[in-house]
Amino acid sequence: MFTLKKSMLLLFFLGTINLSLCEEERNAEEERRDEPDEMDVEVEKRFLPVIAGVAAKFLPKIFCAITKKC
């Protein structure tokens, strides 16, 4: 009876370790999937001020040309 309990405990322990390793791999895969999204946000942050600067330069000229009130 003792050997049966010992082997069952060993199987439970190994199964628990295997399950935790699978969860770690799953978390690592999710982190890898998140990286491109973070890179997209960084790219947006870099280009947004440039676009705003260009718009600030040309909007008054365009508004002046449309309304002809310069």
UniProtKB/Swiss-Prot annotation:
Keyword entries, A-Z: Amphibian defense peptide, Antibiotic, Antimicrobial, Cleavage on pair of basic residues, Disulfide bond, Fungicide, Secreted, Signal
Annotated disulfide bonds: 64-70
Compartment(s) where it occurs, according to its Swiss-Prot or TrEMBL record: Secreted
Tissue: Expressed by the skin glands.
Propeptide: 23-44
BP GO terms, sorted: defense response to bacterium; defense response to fungus; killing of cells of another organism
Signal peptide stretch: 1-22
Superkingdom of this protein's organism: Eukaryota
InterPro entries found in the cross-reference section: Antimicrobial_frog_1 (IPR012520), Frog_antimicrobial_propeptide (IPR004275)
GO CC list: extracellular region
Family the UniProt entry places it in: Belongs to the frog skin active peptide (FSAP) family. Brevinin subfamily.
Function recorded in the entry: Antimicrobial activity against the Gram-negative bacterium E.coli, the Gram-positive bacterium S.aureus and the yeast C.albicans.
The protein's name: Brevinin-1PLc
